[in-house]
Structure formats: structure tokens, C-alpha cells
């Protein structure tokens, strides 16, 4: 395995291979992908589907001189394997290893950092403009999937690129076969005709000639109408032509010769070109071919069977959310569910099956999802927008302007909040407390366990205004689930442990950690109170002030950035109430982007473990009891 792959480190090496060798290389790459992702987890099906396309791109274009931008970037594994990262590929998505997404800091071949959807065409257009302004000569290629083309920013960029007419290539990787019926003799003929240089030159000469004769313009318009009628009938790319692009395709994305030929034609063309490539998600691995959605993003699995390696029998927060939504649908007949191309990812598959008329997958259109929910709310419904924390950032203005300004009853179910692990900086949900907290009318909740999650969702749906419930990407605590729902009083914290010397004020995933830390501190003779804040907004003012005044030492714990987060809210409260004699120590994520790696490892790296919290409290008490002695020790250290 890897006989040819071991010799490949750049586009130059790809160009030296015959087509027979390239097909052999494609087989080697697929085997490496399957074996590696079965251990590390990752996006398998998308990468299996773009092996030949990636080889074709690197055969025609000269990376890193030519720029290849991968939309979302989850399908860039093949690109990484053939650009000098094969030997390190076993570290994929591991801490300190190869990222699962393009990172310019990792390789000069990663022209632009991606992770969120639909950004590639805008970035590629910007790079093409920069190239032209500097008088440089190289190609810029954006590779975007049909799913990502549902994002509004992609069409904004297409519209702008068509207007500017600069040299830009967009490769549409269509792995849904949604336009497969248009692949036929006439479509193939038109593609061959339009990629012929003689056709292009002849077309330009005829247009120039017609414009010189008196009735030429009328004939030209008539000819365009006839041509457009035929193209609408047989060519699936007419929309791109209308946007100002030359459309080439569809082409078989697993035929290396065909891909190479069409990309060569695209490179030779002037102006914006769209190449439509049809691929099969999961190609070459039967479990992924038969169930591409499950293998889109997957954890460790058994290669022989394709079955996931189950790490825990405890349901995840996502699974609990999905089950709760089904139960809530019986309680609230006006409840609707909305997601942005994440039906399975947000746990809504069963809800969608049982309540198809009450479920809406809007595609990769987070802004639309939120304002759609606002419209539904004005019509008397209670929409739940289920979305990952990192993707909700894309709809900030809609949250503020369309939902909160009008105080509409929209519930935001914010999945993947906090550190998500191996997907890294583009996917951690570390900012939602900070970006939601300043918005008037917004209620923000975070459950300590899965039982509290179901009650918070019920509370949010019973609340007359906007509310957000955020929860992590992890298994629950395994706690007992109540049989019936209950409303949690708005802004009411929960005292889990009384104490007189220090207050551990935690929210969400950090509550269990605080309880364990308090138990250890008790063994050291320190009486710690533990408060489950439940709400980041509104805070339980009475409870927080009572314990802050009693203990004078407060430690806040959150899985969010410190700037503007839960700890900041507590400090603001104490300051506004004149409590200047209280020491507040905030645990959370510092002012930095968190890299990829195992969730437990990353939590430890940023001080969010039981042991590190205990150590910090002990050091604080040692400092209070022996301030001079501790100061000497610190200076020596």
C-alpha cells in the first residue's frame, strides 16, 4: 500500500504519471483514506468521492502557484495526501497533527483556510482580483459541492464574478446526481462543441460580422433566443450562463481523462468558467456508497463491516435533543423544527420522519433559517432552530434584527457548544455566550445534564420571547430522565452544594466538574459551595450575591471564551452592585482560537479539568493564608 503515493509530493509528480498509473494511485489513496479514517474518524464519504477530481486538478493546475480553494474543506484529504503530507496523514485530526480542513499555516498548497460552507467562490474571486491588480498570471480554482451551492454567499459571489468577467474557474462537485438525467448524447455533444477552440473563435467572428451589417443586431438577438431555447431544453447549466459563466459539463467525475480534458479547456478559457462534475459520494467503499450520509462525518469504525466503534452506551446530548423534540411535538401542536442542512447532525431525523409537514431543512442557509423562524413565529407557531454553535454565528444580524428586536418566540437549540474536538478551530462553539448575551430580550440557558436539557427546551417553548439552549458535543451524564416536563423559573440558579469558604459558580458542561472539585476540596478542609447557574441571561442575581458576600471567593467555570462570557457577566453583576471586596477567578477559554484534538485533551490544555480547578483553589487559599511565603516561591519559579 502506498507504492505510488509514497513518491508523490506535488502537482509535478502527478503530471509525470500515466493515466494507468493515476488510476492505480486513486486505488491506493482510497485504501489509505479508509484505513486512516477508520481509526481517527473524519469525513470519509466526501473524500472517497473526489479522488479522481483531485488528481485531475493537480494534473492540470500547478499548485501552489495556481490556487485551489476547497469549499468547506472537509473533502481536502486527497489534496493533502498528494501535497507532501502522506507520511503525517496518520495524525489526521489529532492534536498537533494534520488538520481535517485546509490550513495555510500547514502547507503552501492550502491556498485559503476553510471549514464553513459556501465561502470558496468569494475567496477565489478576491484572489483573482488581487492577481489581476498585481499583473500576475496564474489560475484560481474554487471547488464547491452541490450542497454548499445552497448557501446565499455562493450565489452572491457567482453574480459578482459574472459581472466582473475576470478569469476564474469554479468546479461544481455534484455528488447528489440531481442533474444526472441531463447526461446524454445531446448534452455530451454540446459540451464537446463548446470546448472546441474553433467553436469559440468562430462564434466571436460571426458575432463581429453580424454587428457590422444593418439587420445584423436583430439576427444576433434572434439567434440568441433560439440558442437559449435549445440550451434550456438540454443543458443543465443555463443558470450559470445567465450569471455570466461559461458552463462546461456535466462530466464524469471518476473518469480521469474526461476530467483532465475539461479542466484543460477551462484553464484555456477567458472569463469565469464553471465546470460541472458528477461524482459518487463514498466511491470505492461499499458501506459508504450505500449510506453516504452516515459516512459523511463518522467516528472510528470497523473497516470490514463499516459499523461504528461505540465508545459509550450513554446517549449524546444530540440524541436526547432529538428524542425530546419528538415528545415536545405532542405537547405543542404549533411547534416546528428548522435546520440548515444538518438533519442527522442535529438529531432531527426521527422528528422529520414523524412530522414531515412540521420539519424544514433549508439547506446551507443559516440566515434564511432564522428569519424563516421569525416569520413562522409571527404566524402563531413556535419554531425551534436546531443549529451548531459555530454556524449560528452566520445569522447574527437575523437573530438580533428579525427575532430579538421583535421579541418573537423562537427557540435556538445550539448544538456542538464548547470544545467539539477533532474538527478544530472552525467548528468549536466557543463564542455563543458572548455574541448572544448583549442582545436584548434573549434568554440563554445551558443544562448541566440531559435531564435538564429536556426541561430547558420545554421552558424555552413556554417562554413568550426568544430563548437559546446550548449543549455540548458529548455523551450525557447517564442521569435518570424525568417522565414529564417542567418549567424552570426564568433566571433561577440551582444550589447543588452549600458552602461557606469558596463559591464554584458553573454553567452547562462545567457543573459536573465543579461538583467533583468541591468533593476533593472538602478533603482538603475547604468548604465549597457549588451553584448550577443554568442561565447566563438573566443571571440569578439574588443567589450569586448571597454566596459572593458569604464566601468572598468566586470561581466561575464555563466552556466559552472568557471575553464577554459567563464569567464576565458575573463580574459585571458584582461590580454594578458595588461588591468590590469579592475576588472573582474565571475559568474558560482565553483570547485564542482552539486547535483540533481530542476533547478531553483540549479541556485539560485550557485548564478545564477537576484537578486544575482544585489546584487553583488550593493555591488561592494558600496565598490568602501565607501571602509572603507564596510570593517568594513564585519568584523562584
From Swiss-Prot:
EC number: 2.2.1.7
Coiled-coil region: none
GO terms under cellular component: cytosol
Keyword Magnesium: yes
Binding residues annotated for thiamine diphosphate, in chain numbering: 74, 115-117, 147-148, 175, 285, 366
Catalytic activity: D-glyceraldehyde 3-phosphate + pyruvate + H(+) = 1-deoxy-D-xylulose 5-phosphate + CO2
Cofactor dependency: Mg(2+); thiamine diphosphate
Top enzyme category: transferase
Biological process annotations from GO: 1-deoxy-D-xylulose 5-phosphate biosynthetic process; isopentenyl diphosphate biosynthetic process, methylerythritol 4-phosphate pathway; terpenoid biosynthetic process; thiamine biosynthetic process
Keywords: Isoprene biosynthesis, Magnesium, Metal-binding, Thiamine biosynthesis, Thiamine pyrophosphate, Transferase
Cofactor note (record): Binds 1 Mg(2+) ion per subunit.
Molecular function, one GO term: thiamine pyrophosphate binding
The protein's annotated pathway: Metabolic intermediate biosynthesis; 1-deoxy-D-xylulose 5-phosphate biosynthesis; 1-deoxy-D-xylulose 5-phosphate from D-glyceraldehyde 3-phosphate and pyruvate: step 1/1
Residues that, per the record, bind Mg(2+): 146, 175
The family this protein is said to belong to: Belongs to the transketolase family. DXPS subfamily.
Physiological role: Catalyzes the acyloin condensation reaction between C atoms 2 and 3 of pyruvate and glyceraldehyde 3-phosphate to yield 1-deoxy-D-xylulose-5-phosphate (DXP).
Assembly and oligomerization: Homodimer.
Protein name: 1-deoxy-D-xylulose-5-phosphate synthase
Organism per entry: Pelotomaculum thermopropionicum (strain DSM 13744 / JCM 10971 / SI)
Gene name tied to this protein: dxs
Amino acid at each position: 500500500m502506498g507504492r505510488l503515493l509514497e513518491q508523490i509530493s506535488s502537482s509535478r509528480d502527478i503530471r509525470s504519471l500515466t493515466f494507468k498509473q493515476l488510476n492505480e494511485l486513486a486505488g491506493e489513496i482510497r485504501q489509505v483514506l479508509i484505513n486512516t479514517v477508520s481509526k481517527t474518524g473524519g469525513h470519509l464519504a466526501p473524500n472517497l468521492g473526489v479522488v479522481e477530481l483531485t488528481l485531475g486538478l493537480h494534473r492540470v493546475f500547478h499548485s501552489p502557484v495556481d490556487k485551489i480553494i476547497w469549499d468547506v474543506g472537509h473533502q481536502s484529504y486527497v489534496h493533502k495526501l498528494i501535497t507532501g503530507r502522506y507520511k503525517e496523514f496518520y495524525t489526521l485530526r489529532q492534536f498537533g497533527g494534520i488538520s481535517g480542513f485546509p490550513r495555510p499555516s500547514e502547507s503552501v498548497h492550502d491556498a485559503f483556510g476553510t471549514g464553513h460552507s459556501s465561502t470558496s467562490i468569494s475567496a477565489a474571486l478576491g484572489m483573482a482580483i488581487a492577481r489581476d491588480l498585481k499583473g500576475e498570471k496564474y489560475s484560481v480554482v474554487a471547488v464547491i459541492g452541490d450542497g454548499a451551492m445552497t448557501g446565499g454567499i455562493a450565489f452572491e459571489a457567482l453574480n459578482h464574478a459574472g459581472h466582473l468577467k475576470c478569469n476564474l474557474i469554479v468546479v461544481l462537485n455534484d455528488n447528489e446526481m440531481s442533474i444526472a438525467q441531463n447526461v446524454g448524447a445531446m448534452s455530451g455533444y454540446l459540451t464537446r462543441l463548446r470546448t472546441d477552440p474553433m467553436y469559440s473563435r468562430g462564434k466571436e467572428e460571426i458575432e463581429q460580422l453580424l454587428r457590422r451589417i444593418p439587420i445584423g443586431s436583430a439576427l444576433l438577438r434572434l439567434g440568441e433566443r433560439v440558442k437559449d431555447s435549445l440550451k434550456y431544453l438540454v443543458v443543465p447549466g443555463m443558470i450559470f450562463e445567465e450569471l455570466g459563466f461559461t458552463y462546461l459539463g456535466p462530466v464524469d467525475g471518476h473518469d480521469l481523462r474526461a476530467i483532465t480534458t475539461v479542466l484543460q479547456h477551462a484553464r484555456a478559457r477567458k472569463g469565469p468558467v464553471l465546470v460541472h462534475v458528477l461524482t459518487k459520494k463514498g466511491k470505492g467503499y461499499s458501506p459508504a456508497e450505500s449510506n453516504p450520509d452516515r459516512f459523511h462525518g463518522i467516528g472510528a469504525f470497523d473497516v470490514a463491516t463499516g459499523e461504528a466503534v461505540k465508545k459509550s452506551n450513554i446517549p449524546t446530548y444530540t440524541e436526547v435533543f432529538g428524542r425530546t423534540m419528538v415528545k415536545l411535538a405532542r405537547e405543542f401542536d404549533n411547534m416546528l423544527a428548522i435546520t440548515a442542512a444538518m438533519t442527522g447532525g442535529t438529531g432531527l431525523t426521527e422528528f422529520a420522519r414523524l412530522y414531515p409537514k412540521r420539519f424544514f431543512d433549508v439547506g446551507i442557509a443559516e440566515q434564511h433559517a432564522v428569519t424563516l423562524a421569525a416569520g413562522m413565529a409571527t404566524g402563531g407557531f413556535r419554531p425551534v432552530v436546531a443549529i451548531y454553535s459555530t454556524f449560528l454565528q452566520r445569522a447574527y444580524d437575523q437573530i438580533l434584527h428579525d427575532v430579538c428586536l421583535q421579541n418573537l418566540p423562537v427557540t435556538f437549540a445550539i448544538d456542538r457548544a464548547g470544545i467539539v474536538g477533532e474538527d478544530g478551530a472552525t467548528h468549536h462553539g466557543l463564542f455563543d455566550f458572548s455574541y448572544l448575551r448583549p442582545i436584548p430580550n434573549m434568554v440563554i440557558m445551558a443544562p448541566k445534564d440531559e435531564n435538564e436539557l429536556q426541561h430547558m427546551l420545554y421552558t424555552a417553548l413556554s417562554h413568550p420571547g426568544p430563548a437559546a439552549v446550548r449543549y455540548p458535543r458529548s455523551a450525557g451524564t447517564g442521569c435518570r430522565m424525568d417522565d414529564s416536563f417542567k418549567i424552570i423559573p426564568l433566571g433561577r440558579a440551582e444550589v447543588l452544594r452549600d458552602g461557606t469558604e469558596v463559591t464554584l459558580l458553573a454553567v452547562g458542561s462545567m457543573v459536573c466538574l465543579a461538583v467533583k472539585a468541591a468533593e476533593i476540596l472538602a478533603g482538603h478542609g475547604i468548604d465549597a459551595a457549588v451553584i448550577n447557574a443554568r442561565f447566563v441571561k438573566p443571571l440569578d442575581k439574588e443567589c450569586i450575591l448571597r454566596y459572593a458576600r458569604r464566601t468572598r471567593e468566586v470561581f466561575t467555570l464555563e466552556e466559552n471564551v472568557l471575553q464577554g462570557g459567563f464569567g464576565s457577566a458575573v463580574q459585571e453583576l458584582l461590580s454594578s452592585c458595588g461588591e468590590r471586596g469579592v475576588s472573582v477567578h474565571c475559568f474558560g477559554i482565553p483570547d485564542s482560537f482552539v486547535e483540533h484534538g481530542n476533547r478531553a485533551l483540549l479541556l485539560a490544555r485550557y485548564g478545564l479539568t477537576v484537578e486544575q480547578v482544585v489546584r487553583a483553589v488550593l493555591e488561592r487559599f494558600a496565598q490568602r493564608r501565607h501571602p509572603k511565603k507564596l510570593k517568594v516561591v513564585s519568584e523562584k519559579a
